[in-house]
Design a protein with these regions (language model features):
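Alpha-helical transmembrane segments of multi-pass membrane proteins
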Residues: 14-32
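Pore domain of cation channels
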Residues: 159-167, 173-212
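Perimembrane loop-to-helix junctions flanking transmembrane segments
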Residues: 32-48
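Structural signature of hydrophobic alpha-helical transmembrane segments
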Residues: 47-60
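Hydrophobic alpha-helical membrane-embedded segments
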Residues: 67-71, 119-137
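Outer-pore turret/helix-boundary of cation channels
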Residues: 130-162
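Long, highly hydrophobic alpha-helical transmembrane signal-anchor segments
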Residues: 80-129
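N-terminal membrane topogenic signal
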Residues: 1-14
């Protein structure tokens, strides 16, 4: 098995944060402006969550710029990253919950529902890929073991490995070849699996209903 991941590379760290934020904003816009009526109380809750997420994202972005300019990585950056991911995860759960709760009230086109599912899928993959990368980097002994690459047995896992792990968790409701050690990682995977199941059972079923 390969060794656990090293420290988060600055540029890839910034890239993943931006990807998470873009996916989160697209999903939030889809829910609050296109799926919920103005008089629905949940809309205000979702908007508040988005505002908090934007503020934390700006804080993370400023810290990341400082890391690049100063060529340093303070240890407290992980606390900032955990705060951002926590807010992003809560927003994801709220948005998915809003989509699921209003699924039977939707009167939208087939392709629009597919767009909803695609956004949820993309947001979930990015958010949890970053969680898995952070957990594997920071937990003692690492959180995962990845299959060894015969051509490069000492290769450390990179971003594509964690995106692949997150994608497979969405698609198969669990890891494939990876071994999960840390309890925190197991909890994160259960949350991701639950979100995927909700999307599959409710939203995909709604798509089938629209198509009939």
């Amino acid at each position: 098995m390969v060794r656990r991941a090293g420290a988060l590379p600055t540029w890839s760290f910034i890239g993943m944060i931006v990807a998470v934020q873009v996916a989160d904003r697209l999903l939030a816009h889809q829910v609050t402006f296109d799926r919920l009526a103005d008089d629905v109380p949940a809309r205000d809750v979702l908007r508040a969550g988005q505002a908090v997420g934007d503020v934390v994202f700006l804080a993370v972005a400023l810290v990341a710029v400082g890391m690049v300019l100063l060529h340093s990585r303070p240890r407290w950056i992980n606390a900032v990253l955990v705060a951002y991911l926590s807010v992003a995860t809560i927003n994801l759960v709220l948005n998915v919950g809003a989509l699921v709760a209003t699924a039977d009230q939707m009167r939208v086109a087939h392709l629009a529902l597919l767009w909803d599912v695609g956004l949820v899928y993309l947001s979930t993959v990015f958010v949890f890929a970053l969680w898995y990368r952070l957990l594997d980097c920071e937990l003692t002994g690492g959180a995962f073991e990845f299959p060894v690459d015969p051509a490069r047995p000492d290769r450390r896992p990179g971003w594509i490995d964690y995106v692949f792990l997150s994608f497979n968790t969405n698609a198969t409701f669990g890891p494939t070849a990876e071994v999960v050690h840390a309890r925190t990682a197991k909890v994160a995977m259960m949350v991701q699996t639950l979100i995927s199941l909700l999307v599959l059972v409710v939203l995909v079923a709604r798509i089938v209903g629209v198509g009939q």
